[in-house]
A protein has these predicted regions:
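A short coil-to-beta-strand element that immediately follows conserved catalytic motifs
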Residues: 93-105
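Glycine-rich phosphate-binding loops at beta-strand->alpha-helix junctions
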Residues: 71-81
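PRPP/pyrophosphate-binding module of the type I phosphoribosyltransferase fold
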Residues: 104-210
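Conserved beta-strand elements of the Class I
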Residues: 66-68, 137
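Short, solvent-exposed amphipathic alpha-helices that sit
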Residues: 80-89, 151
Length: 211
């Protein structure tokens, strides 16, 4: 877990990107968990982890909090990835749950295609009542550089949020492993990896949250 001022970040597992090869069994398992999550395929145990960490953050004071989801590249992707988790949290907590607080004004390519630094804050629309005077929990699948989280959190704070806290399934790591041949979506893998590692090291050097 990483905490700074009125922000905090928690994650469950570590994610090794698919452009690495030679992963061990644990790394392969966690990679599958993340990729399945992206497709909306996850079990009750994983949803329970999010619920338990929401409880830890709110300390039982659920009424001054709001749970939102970081935006996917389209409404369809948002529903596919987070729809089941949204419904579970609505049924099992008393906190406000908002699937579509944030969205892109114009269609956005997935951030791992365009590069994290190219995300346009002005392209993110925000439903202000979901965050105004609230302690906001932002949920997403992976935190890599923290760019999307930080920019979205900045916008929410400008619109009156009291604090911002991130809950992520996984944190991206870059182990000392060989890389596969470059694919069409990552033309400059080496520089992106160096940038991701540098930013993430500044963000946090702590281990993943206990399961």
């Amino acid at each position: 877990m990483y905490i700074k001022n009125n922000h905090s970040i928690r994650w469950k597992i570590q994610y090794v990107p698919t452009y690495y090869e030679g992963l061990n069994e644990d790394q392969e398992r966690d990679q599958r968990i993340v990729l399945n999550f992206k497709d909306g395929n996850y079990n009750d145990d994983l949803m329970l982890w999010f619920r338990q960490n929401i409880w830890k953050l709110t300390e039982g004071d659920e009424y001054s909090w709001s749970v939102c989801f970081l935006p996917c590249s389209s409404d369809e992707e948002q529903q596919k990835r987070f729809g089941k988790l949204e419904q579970y949290l609505k049924e099992n907590t008393r906190i406000e749950i908002h699937l579509s607080t944030f969205g892109y004004v114009e269609k956005q390519e997935p951030s791992h295609y365009i590069g994290k630094s190219d995300i346009d804050l002005m392209n993110i629309a925000l439903h202000v009542p979901d965050v105004y005077m609230k302690n906001v929990i932002l949920i997403d699948d992976i935190i890599t550089t923290g760019e999307t989280f930080n920019r979205t959190a900045e916008q929410a704070m400008r619109m009156g949020a009291n604090s911002i806290h991130g809950l992520f399934l996984a944190k991206t790591i870059h182990p000392d492993l060989p890389m596969k041949e470059k694919n069409s979506h990552r033309e400059d893998d080496d520089s992106i990896i160096r940038e991701e590692a540098e930013i993430m090291n500044k963000l946090s050097n702590l281990p993943p949250e206990d399961n």
